[in-house]
Design a protein with these regions (language model features):
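A preference for well-ordered globular domain cores
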Residues: 1-151
Length: 151
């Protein structure tokens, strides 16, 4: 799930500290500090003036939107990769016996590999589903290929 802290981490290459959860512009201004150096005891020198910071709230919200936009595809790839990993034992079985891989398995695996280019995944909007199962794709946004029954 996207977070403002993640967005900051992706766009801010300068040293910084976050002292609390960031949920809006006010908490960003209260909790974000740019680190400008260290004093003689090696304690960070923090700048609390937003005018001196390398990022602004608008930078953070723009990156947050980028993260949210890519999440459905990341979930799709994760689920797809799990399904491809399940195919490994089938592939090893045929390879270890010097047997040709059945066409239905080749097609199934290729269809899985092609999914990111062939669909536009959408995450479930239900808070209940997210709380119980984590991020899930809507069934209407992805047509998963049918796993061959023969092994």
């Amino acid at each position: 799930m996207a977070s403002y802290e993640q967005a900051i981490g992706e766009i801010c290459s300068s040293p910084y500290v976050i002292r609390g959860r960031i949920t809006n512009e006010q908490t960003f201004l209260e909790n974000f500090r740019s680190v400008t150096g260290a004093d003689s005891s090696m304690t960070a020198i923090e700048d609390s003036n937003p005018d001196n910071w390398p990022i602004s709230w608008s930078n953070v919200t723009a990156q947050y939107a980028v993260i949210e936009a890519r999440e459905p595809m990341e979930v799709l790839r994760h689920e797809r990769n799990q399904k491809l990993a399940e195919c490994d034992k089938i592939t090893l079985k045929y390879m270890s016996q010097n047997l040709p891989m059945p066409d239905e398995w080749k097609t199934y695996m290729q269809t899985l590999r092609d999914l990111p280019e062939n669909c536009t995944p959408v995450l479930e909007a239900s808070a209940d589903i997210m709380a119980m199962h984590g991020k899930q794709l809507t069934s209407a946004s992805v047509t998963w290929p049918t796993k061959p029954s023969s092994e």
